[in-house]
């Protein structure tokens, strides 16, 4: 029997939701955000079928909303399976699946990124100052259309040594706000 003072799952979720911006800010400090930088929240994330944990991707920016450092896009775990949810860095082994193949900053400030999880797809992170705040968005081709990337879903089955990815789903929206979706079959 639950006491009247014990929090329900709904209250825990509300508490977490209210703390999420602070946790994201803590993650930026923890993972080496440059002093004085103005890093926006996660620009997209990867969900998986294994559990509710997510891999998030953010971008380090300077005070003028320009990419900070030679490899400004970074990743981290949002461990939603833990109580309360926590932010953690990816391990070396996890970076081999969810890390970066390359990052390149173009003269106009765009950041071209290739992920190990999507090696055949180029992602472009664009950053702008909007209303005094830095705003970053990720673009890529989804179902043959240039679109904003919202999230990636990876479905994998347990293998002998490592999970075997069966398919990847891309979720985004076109410039006019219409939802776009693509499923990429990977496994047999």
Regions picked out by a protein language model, each given a short descriptive name:
Residues 1-17:
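N-terminal secretory signal peptides that target proteins for export/translocation
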Residues 18-31:
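Bacterial N-terminal signal peptides
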Residues 35-91:
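N-terminal export/targeting and maturation segments
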Residues 46, 113-115, 123-125, 168-170, ...:
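Hydrophobic beta-strand residues in large extracellular and virion-surface proteins
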Residues 77-147:
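Mature extracytoplasmic domains of secretory-pathway proteins
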Residues 145-159:
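Beta-sandwich interaction modules
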Residues 159-183:
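Short, exposed beta-strand-loop hairpins at the edges of beta-sheets
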Residues 186-188:
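Short, solvent-exposed mixed-charge patches
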């Amino acid at each position: 029997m639950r006491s009247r003072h014990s929090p329900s799952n709904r209250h825990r979720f509300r508490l977490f939701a209210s703390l999420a911006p602070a946790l994201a800010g803590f993650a930026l400090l923890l993972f080496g955000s440059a002093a004085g930088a103005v890093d926006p929240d996660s620009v997209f994330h990867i969900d998986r079928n294994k559990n509710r944990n997510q891999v998030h991707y953010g971008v380090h920016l300077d005070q003028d909303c320009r990419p900070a450092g030679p490899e400004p896009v970074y990743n981290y775990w949002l461990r939603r399976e833990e109580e309360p949810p926590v932010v953690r860095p990816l391990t070396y082994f996890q970076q081999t699946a969810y890390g970066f193949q390359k990052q390149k900053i173009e003269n106009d400030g765009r950041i071209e990124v290739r992920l190990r999880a999507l090696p055949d797809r180029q992602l472009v992170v664009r950053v702008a100052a909007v209303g005094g705040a830095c705003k970053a968005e990720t673009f890529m081709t989804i179902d043959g259309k240039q679109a904003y990337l919202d999230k990636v879903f990876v479905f994998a089955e347990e293998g002998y040594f490592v999970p075997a990815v069966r398919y990847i789903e891309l979720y985004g929206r076109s410039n006019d706000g219409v939802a776009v979706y693509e499923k990429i079959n990977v496994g047999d």
